[in-house]
Amino acid sequence: MSTKVLIISKVRTHPVKMGNNKAILAQAEMLKDLDCVVDYLYVQEMGLHGDVKENEVSYQQTKDYWGDHFLFLKVSKIEKFCKNLIAKYRKVFCGRHEGTYDPYPWQLTQYVKQLQKERGYDICLVQYYCLTKLFKKVRFNKMACFTHDAMAYKNLLVDENCPWINADQEARALQQCTDIFAIQEEEKDYFHILSPKSRVYNIYTPYSYKSTPYVGNKTLLFLSGNNGFNQNGLQWFIESVFPLIREKFSDAQLLIAGGICNVIKGKYDNISGIRLMGYVKDPMDLYELGDVAINPVYQGTGLKIKTFESISFDKVTLVHPHSVAGIYKKETAPLFVSDKPEEWVAYLERIWSDKATIMKIKEENQKYIESMNEFIVDEYKRFLAD
């Protein structure tokens, strides 16, 4: 008999534009590949002044994908209004220190309790720590949380005034779980300390390897969303590294694609050698244009998406040291890692004059992605068997 799994998320799976969309969808598909029957409960919490049309489109795309396995719970405007008041109070009087379960939907426990009575799920898998409150009232054979990120003291981790919780709050939330999914190695170790009686798995996110031909130009590629960490990393590269590259290689180009183009338009696109491509429907539209990709991001937590993505698209990949934290087999990953601009230039000088080395790195890219994907499958098999 197939294992029955209920995934609960306040994040939709479609359209797949952000890292968390991709991670949740990949998790669901992995469980289905391992013969689980997976239902998806989408808890929709719209802003009071949000884009109704955009939410309707994403809702419909998610519902169409899941079909008969789609479940839905909508947070009311009254509840959202109250949550906004709480958030303002936390901001003014608590330095944005949140309550552990401030985001928890009021109707979720009763709704899932009825679902469990009717359907009898073996596993419940919630997305993010703030939904683990459910497990205080509704029981399953396995009660799991896909953390996506380490949340404690996030304001200090990213050096920004953002909502945060402390380690005790995060520990108490995760201790409601029998099983915890981390998205990188360092966070796996951290969660095991917070919740020593829980089983902790490191699942990264699987990537498909896509072979790309050797191009032979002097083009650097950067595909990114528009969050502040990505903007800061790109600014560091453009101000500290790219001028040195252009001094050495007057024909060097930086191609930038993705949502980040919307927020940097007019800031960098007038700099010689930089071109903004905007939104690309298929990442291959960017990655087929050069041999080298960069990830200069030096802030943030969680999965290093751009690092893995660049390897999976068969690129020679240059990264800031922050962007290898916790990745699969960090010491042997096919990456150039440095925070020193002159070392980036020296490496490019060597790579751009040596096709054989580029082709060797491409071989290593394929082996790395295949090895990581095998590891991920084994982690899920271990989760289902434990």
Predicted regions and their residues:
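Acidic donor-binding loop of glycosyltransferase active sites
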Residues: E288-G302, F313-K315
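Donor nucleotide-sugar binding/catalytic pocket of nucleotide-sugar-dependent glycosyltransferases
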Residues: A144, A171, Q175-S211
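Conserved catalytic-core segment of nucleotide-activated headgroup transferases in glycan assembly
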Residues: N202-N270, L276, V280-K281, E288
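Active-site proximal beta-strand in glycosyltransferases
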Residues: V138-L156
